[in-house]
Regions:
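Contiguous domain-boundary segments centered on the initiation and propagation of an alpha-helix
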Residues: 68-116
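A structural-propensity feature for long, helix-poor, extended segments
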Residues: 41, 45-84
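A conserved regulatory-domain signal marking ACT and ACT-like small-molecule sensing domains
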Residues: 77, 89-94, 118-219
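Short glycine/threonine-rich loop-to-helix capping motif typified by GTGT followed
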Residues: 51-57, 101, 189-191
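Short, hydrophobic/aliphatic alpha-helical segments
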Residues: 1-10, 40-42
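Conserved phosphate/anionic-ligand binding catalytic regions in large, soluble enzymes, centered on
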Residues: 9-26
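Alpha-helical scaffold segments in soluble metabolic enzymes
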Residues: 5-6, 24-32, 60, 64, ...
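Non-transmembrane, aqueous-exposed alpha-helical and coiled segments at domain scale
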Residues: 33-41
């Protein structure tokens, strides 16, 4: 029996703060994927790999992927819930060297075989970062309203997105663009001071070269 079985899901203390962080990483992956996956392949590294069972990190990651938050009592039965929902879970530790000691790689597969792969890290103090999305470098913290575009790298897209946001008086706090190469695939991550309205999201989707647009609320 692990510590989580004894104390339960109340999020207090540094040990259970780690559970909350793991749930946030799983939730962020779920929000980016925008649907419940049919399969989740999870690899934990570093400290996560050494303590993921006894500390409840495994259940927290699965809970987040299922859309269950750290303060939800269902977290402790996340594996059973995944089975009920017919979500296949494969979780393995790895001793491979990584840049950060608390790292997890999550690969989600949907009903249409669409795949999302993210790399997330725990920074301590309850903070997380998603540092890779489908092979792209990324910086996602879950602390802001976020707009993400998946698009073809071509002139004018960044300007048009910025203009559409300005027309709705949406203030941009940060904007980062990552691309696989010139005139190739690109991801733009925009943190805003407020939620981007649905009509603006639909307008951005119509921009030539934009493949997908998603919005993420603060966790």
């Amino acid at each position: 029996m692990g510590m989580f079985d004894i104390i339960g899901p109340i999020m207090i203390g540094p040990l259970l703060a780690g559970i909350a962080v793991a749930a946030r990483i799983g939730l962020m992956a779920r929000h980016i994927f925008q649907e419940e996956p049919k399969k989740a392949d999870i690899i934990v590294y570093g400290s996560f790999a050494k303590t993921y069972r006894g500390h409840g990190t495994d259940r927290a990651l699965v809970a987040g992927i299922l859309g269950i938050g750290a303060d939800d009592v269902r977290l402790r039965t996340s594996f059973e819930i995944a089975k009920e929902r017919h979500v296949e879970i494969n979780l393995h530790p790895s001793d491979a060297e990584v840049r950060h000691p608390n790292t997890v790689r999550i690969r989600l597969t949907g009903e249409d075989n669409r795949v999302l792969e993210v790399l997330g890290v725990s920074l301590g103090g309850g903070k997380i970062e998603i540092r890779e999305i489908n092979g792209f470098e990324a910086v996602l913290t879950g602390e802001d309203h976020t707009l993400m575009t998946f698009h073809h790298d071509k002139p004018g897209i960044i300007a048009r997105v910025s203009t559409l946001l300005a027309m709705k008086d949406i203030n941009v706090s940060t904007m980062r663009v990552f691309r696989s190469g010139r005139n190739e695939r690109a991801v733009m991550i925009i943190a805003t001071d407020g939620r981007v309205p649905n009509e603006s999201v639909e307008e951005i989707k119509k921009i030539d070269g934009v493949n997908n647009v998603i919005t993420i609320l603060p966790l």
